[in-house]
């Protein structure tokens, strides 16, 4: 919601704090497929941008009528509409929204009021690219692996909000390291789940997670007009593989090969025994 509000405020010329994003209300928005699949910014973002531009066009027409100027000469910044070069004489967007109800300037556009509804249909998905690297330490006696450092490099296309993007990638990376080192659904021979509580299902704790460094490299997408790419899933996907590869590298002298995760001490010990048997 934060990034969508940023886009709306930027395109319209409104103050960010004045933008309210309503989500999940099926009485107002019956059409939608949810927020999964790394598609919020890639799909919803362009629709929000186009809608804000249409509202801005209407606001400029109303402001031009009130300020006795051409719509092309109207600027809207920080929630104020004014004639270019004369910012001292301005009208708030709130006042314009009231004036728009009766404004004759909107007659050619078909309806009164500062409102718009648009849809964006992407031609295909926006592929995001990235990589992750882990530094681990393995105790060859206890077969315990410990994560020492972690880094993420990701291409989000255009970064609308770097803090949110980095946070998503870091949160996803924690999920990935959990899959690589800790979390596992364990069943007995009858199919009974044995790791069904936090007593048995190991989730990452603060001391399991090192500082996660994030670097963003921007290569804008050509699939949507904002140039954005998905981020939500990208942080979680490479983690387990990065950690297992790091463990294999740490144990390269033992010729260890790990084919299954998470890399628990039991699995690492078994992999070391298998390597010894292979000679």
Region spans (language model):
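Cofactor-binding beta-sheet edge motifs in enzyme active sites
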Residues: 1-279
């Amino acid at each position: 919601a934060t990034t969508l509000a940023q886009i709306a405020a930027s395109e319209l010329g409104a103050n960010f704090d004045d933008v309210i994003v309503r989500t999940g209300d099926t009485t107002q928005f019956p059409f939608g497929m949810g927020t999964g699949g790394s598609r919020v910014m890639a799909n919803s973002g362009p629709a929000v941008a186009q809608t804000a531009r249409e509202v801005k066009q209407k606001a400029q027409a109303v402001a031009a009528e009130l300020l006795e100027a051409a719509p092309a000469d109207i600027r809207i910044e920080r929630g104020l509409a004014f004639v270019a070069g004369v910012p001292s004489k301005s009208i708030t967007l709130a006042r314009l929204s009231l004036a728009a109800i009766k404004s004759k300037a909107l007659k050619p556009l078909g309806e009164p009021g500062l409102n718009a509804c648009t849809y964006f249909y992407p031609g295909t998905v926006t592929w995001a690219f990235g990589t992750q690297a882990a530094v681990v330490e393995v105790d060859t006696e206890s077969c315990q692996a410990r994560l020492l450092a972690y880094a993420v490099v990701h291409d989000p296309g255009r970064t609308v909000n770097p803090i949110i993007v980095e946070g998503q990638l870091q949160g996803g990376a924690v999920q990935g390291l959990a899959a690589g080192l800790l979390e596992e659904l364990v069943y007995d021979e009858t199919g009974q789940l044995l790791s069904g509580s936090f007593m048995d299902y190991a989730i990452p704790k603060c001391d399991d997670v090192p500082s996660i460094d994030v670097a963003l490299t921007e290569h804008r997408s050509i699939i949507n007009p904002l140039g954005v790419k998905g981020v939500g899933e990208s942080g979680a996907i490479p983690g387990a593989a990065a950690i297992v590869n790091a463990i294999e590298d740490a144990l390269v002298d033992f010729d260890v090969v790990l084919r299954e995760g998470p890399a628990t001490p039991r699995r690492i010990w078994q992999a070391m025994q298998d390597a010894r048997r292979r000679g």
